[in-house]
Amino acid sequence: MARTVVVGLGRSGIGAARLLQAEGHQVTVLERSIEPHLQSLAADLRLQGIAVELGKPLELNSFIPLLDQLDAVVISPGIAWDHPTLTALRQRGIDIDGEMAVAWRSLSHLPWIAITGTNGKTTVTHLLNHVLESNGLRAPMGGNVGHAAAEVALKWRQPNAQRPDWLVMELSSYQIEAAPEIAPRMGIWTNLTPDHLERHGTLDAYRTIKRGLLERSEIRIFNGDDPDLRSQRSSWDKGLWVSSEGPGTANHRADFWIDAEGLVREPQGALFAASALAMPGQHNLQNLLLVTAAARQTGLPAKAIEASLRSFPGVPHRLEQLGHIQQMSVYNDSKATNYDAACVGLKAVPPPAVVLAGGQTKQGDASGWLKQLDQNACAVILFGAGASELQELIKTSGFSGELHCCSNLNAAVTLAIPLGVERQAACLLLSPACASFDQYQDFEARGEHFRSLISSHLTA
């Protein structure tokens, strides 16, 4: 019997293996590591009838014993689509899929709302899920946030499972690239700035991947405030455009916008006050409009959307306000994993700020972030693997505030608190501008560590 190999015992790999096994496939999971927590996960999967082999790197030799019966290989988003081993397997006639493609084949009969973009997509995903479910619609979310898409599909297969009205799926460029068949009912594109260039090579290649998802979407929703998306507007024959900067010009009219009085509008009239969403920053006004546009396409009335916006609790690790230390507001923006996201977050908080930044650096244009640091930060404390590189970058920019380097986040927080009090900073902001993988499993783990370090110091 043909066998499918799933590579990796991460969230998406486990989801794909379980879904494929439930659909009747013979499944083997290959995992390069042998760490104790993975041995426990492997034992659980074996009890479900799924074969697992640990200590198997992504090399052709790991697949040789299975080649005679191998039908397909499913990879996680963290594996490059053009990895040499995958190329060698394709040359042998073996299909390569991403976990998202496996989920799509199981869920394609349901209407998807797919959210992509460099930044903002997680907030939009959470907010849209909240708006839809607050109004009685079944709209589970997953993909790049929350549950793996395959786990969402598994839940739908359970006896007596209620059919979802919508599936709210966040898709990264990695997931889109490995699932080119996904064709959502609705696609939302939040923005595009240089990111993941170490994976995709060029901004054009990165843009093309995300554009493909929107081209396959029946309803397309775009952030017209984003310079890159706006520059591409004439290339789209249809779509809904939103703008937090007004109705636009005759040639670039917005379909949803915020007027001079702070009201959210559509061509038929005013809907509600933009202040219904209590999240700081211009970027969150854009997120509000994207969600409003999508919610209106599902048929929700303005009053229902407004009430849901007012009850939204926010998203962990995205400008999450943790409390105060004396006069300082404390924000956890661990999700700011690139320069553009960090710049947006810094614009949204009250100055002057003590900024904690660092981790695994990425390619990208740091000029906007450096300018914002000089305008809004009285001190920057760097930590992690990229601290020295960032220190040189910030020094070269002529930053006028205090600049310190620490080995890790513990030391950075220990230094930041008294420094912020002394400098009478308005806020203490974790905004790394870097990936987390030098010292953490993911940005969530980094944010949770920051929360634990800061909790005993909070005064309100």
Curated annotation (Swiss-Prot):
Q: Which organism is it from?
A: Prochlorococcus marinus (strain MIT 9313)
Residue positions annotated to bind ATP are: 117-123
What Gene3D superfamilies does the record tag this protein with? Mur ligase, C-terminal domain, Mur-like, catalytic domain, NAD(P)-binding Rossmann-like Domain
| Name of the protein in its database record | UDP-N-acetylmuramoylalanine--D-glutamate ligase
Give GO BP annotations, semicolon-separated.
cell division; cell wall organization; peptidoglycan biosynthetic process; regulation of cell shape
Q: Show the stretches that span the lipid bilayer.
A: none
Q: Which reaction does it catalyse?
A: UDP-N-acetyl-alpha-D-muramoyl-L-alanine + D-glutamate + ATP = UDP-N-acetyl-alpha-D-muramoyl-L-alanyl-D-glutamate + ADP + phosphate + H(+)
What pathway annotation does it carry?
Cell wall biogenesis; peptidoglycan biosynthesis
Q: Which terms does the record give in the GO molecular function aspect? A: ATP binding; tetrahydrofolylpolyglutamate synthase activity; UDP-N-acetylmuramoylalanine-D-glutamate ligase activity
Q: What is its EC number?
A: 6.3.2.9
Q: Would you identify the family this protein belongs to, as annotated? A: Belongs to the MurCDEF family.
Q: Name a GO CC annotation attached to this entry.
A: cytoplasm
